[in-house]
């Protein structure tokens, strides 16, 4: 019997595959509001290893502090407003039903009150396309259009940190430090590059799979690699 392959080790769960969430600063939820408009002053813009975009540390009227996602153009000293009747300006938070068509939005709630689930990555934004009495249509960054409840809240603007992917890592060491903050094992070694004891595709005089790559859905752990229960393989013609 060979060694456990990576997918088996990941299932067991070890620090290698566990996100270092004790180093994460915040969930970066939307500011809560009821009947009154909440004004929050931006104290600082900070990096959070949990996400790609920066977060803004804001001070609430009661003196408490919390984090929100930072949008493009937001800086220290700015004031962010959250409420039912707020100005349609970058950084403000309100219900989708109040946002005009064509307005860029981010950090949209999946269900009213959950604090924001969609469009949170750096440089991303969606558009309000249209609205009906009981739902609002938003175009997502992927181009797909999705309906939301009109009482789902959203932040107006574009998530800061756009253009992050334009700059190459250049050195493997920089990529290493980035991946250390994620729940990911890196670098990712190909199965055919391993020894036979480490992977079903490993071993041999040269790098080749050496056996059918398709495998049964009922294959045992450790053999279940490749094209799992594939209906077809090869280039679709």
Curated annotation (Swiss-Prot):
GO CC, alphabetical: cytosolic large ribosomal subunit
rRNA-binding in keyword set: yes
Keyword tags: Ribonucleoprotein, Ribosomal protein, RNA-binding, rRNA-binding
GO biological process terms, semicolon-separated: cytoplasmic translation
Gene Ontology terms, MF aspect: rRNA binding; structural constituent of ribosome
Biased composition (Polar residues): 1-11
Region feature (Disordered): 1-20, 201-237
Reported function: One of the primary rRNA binding proteins. Required for association of the 30S and 50S subunits to form the 70S ribosome, for tRNA binding and peptide bond formation. It has been suggested to have peptidyltransferase activity; this is somewhat controversial. Makes several contacts with the 16S rRNA in the 70S ribosome.
Protein name: Large ribosomal subunit protein uL2
Phylogenetic lineage: Archaea, Methanobacteriati, Methanobacteriota, Archaeoglobi, Archaeoglobales
